Amino acid sequence: MSVVLRHDWDRKELQALFDLPFPELLHRAASVHRAHFDPAQVQVSTLLSVKTGGCPEDCAYCPQAQRYDTGVSAQKLMETEEVVAKARQAKAAGASRFCMGAAWRSPKERDIPKVAAMIREVKAMGLETCATLGMLDAGQARALKDAGLDYYNHNLDTAPDYYDSIIHTRQYQDRLNTLEHVRDVGLKTCCGGIVGMGETREHRIGLLLALATLPAHPDSVPINQLVQVPGTPLHGTQQLDPFEFVRMIAVARIAMPKSMVRLSAGRETMSDELQALCFLAGANSIFYGEKLLTTGNPDTERDQALFQRLGLRPMQVTVDAAEHDHPGTVHAEITRSAACEHAA
């Protein structure tokens, strides 16, 4: 199947995809997926909160916002040795990428060298590195790149026209500016959003439209299902129809055919059957481990059993930590010939 990488999607086109009969949408998404990836391989990441709680923002979904009574207390930035120990455990459990998250609006200058040390140590273990630290300026993005960071996560969260219903302390343009800084220094981007926050299908289309018309598609697109935490304003929101969630995955795959589409937060309450539909629809990345920052995630044994039932295997990567001209060069051990073989 010939797939053209596009950045000129319009709302009507994405609406038409969402409106397709469910079997037809999954067929199209699976065909696009097979054109670029081995459908039996799933990239596995582990996420660690290296600085928890005390965030001054007001994101309505977030238990780490200090203004909400969620039982999450503010903690100091972890020591590098603690982070390395967690990364070692993640690698032993099968993760190929280690993501470090901090509950900051944006990092202070004194924090960047500490995070850079974490990145260097984790990279030396042969893991891909990812960080999500809030808003970055150009200099901070460069410092993280120079430390060997591979990916920076900064989500758009939702559609531009629904954003003010969720967040008031940061503008949509602030998020776009951070993504621009990250791209400009050559970091790979991890950028997606959250569904099930009371938005309409039109808002979900708006989120995908914003992502698919960025100057460069995100390398990873996490699709999160809202995890409702008592004490946050969104606790008690009506649950999203599971088939609508699968449609979100499928349209993301079609609109951004070469991106990794990550089945992200919310998996703990998803059935194996729902997750299988998501993999069929084009999801090819997950967070692996019992916790995502402060919320639950399926334990590793459950994921291993699911992979075995579905015949899936973790995508293997090799990281060249000694590459000086291009620190953090990553080679996924997945070949175009393998992808074509499964597409045949």
From Swiss-Prot:
PROSITE patterns: RADICAL_SAM. [2Fe-2S] cluster binds at residues 99, 130, 190, 262. Binds 1 [4Fe-4S] cluster. The cluster is coordinated with 3 cysteines and an exchangeable S-adenosyl-L-methionine. Binds 1 [2Fe-2S] cluster. The cluster is coordinated with 3 cysteines and 1 arginine. One of its GO terms (biological process) is biotin biosynthetic process. Its cofactor is [4Fe-4S] cluster; [2Fe-2S] cluster. Keywords: 2Fe-2S, 4Fe-4S, Biotin biosynthesis, Iron, Iron-sulfur, Metal-binding, S-adenosyl-L-methionine, Transferase. It catalyses: (4R,5S)-dethiobiotin + (sulfur carrier)-SH + 2 reduced [2Fe-2S]-[ferredoxin] + 2 S-adenosyl-L-methionine = (sulfur carrier)-H + biotin + 2 5'-deoxyadenosine + 2 L-methionine + 2 oxidized [2Fe-2S]-[ferredoxin]. It holds the Pfam family BATS. The keyword Disulfide bond does not apply. Residues 40-267 form the Radical SAM core domain. [4Fe-4S] cluster binds at residues 55, 59, 62. Its EC number is 2.8.1.6. GO terms for molecular function: 2 iron, 2 sulfur cluster binding; 4 iron, 4 sulfur cluster binding; biotin synthase activity; iron ion binding. Transmembrane segments: none annotated. It comes from the Bacteria. Pathway: Cofactor biosynthesis; biotin biosynthesis; biotin from 7,8-diaminononanoate: step 2/2. Catalyzes the conversion of dethiobiotin (DTB) to biotin by the insertion of a sulfur atom into dethiobiotin via a radical-based mechanism. NCBIfam families: bioB. Belongs to the radical SAM superfamily. Biotin synthase family. Homodimer. This is Biotin synthase. The lineage of its organism: Bacteria, Pseudomonadati, Pseudomonadota, Gammaproteobacteria, Lysobacterales. The gene is bioB.
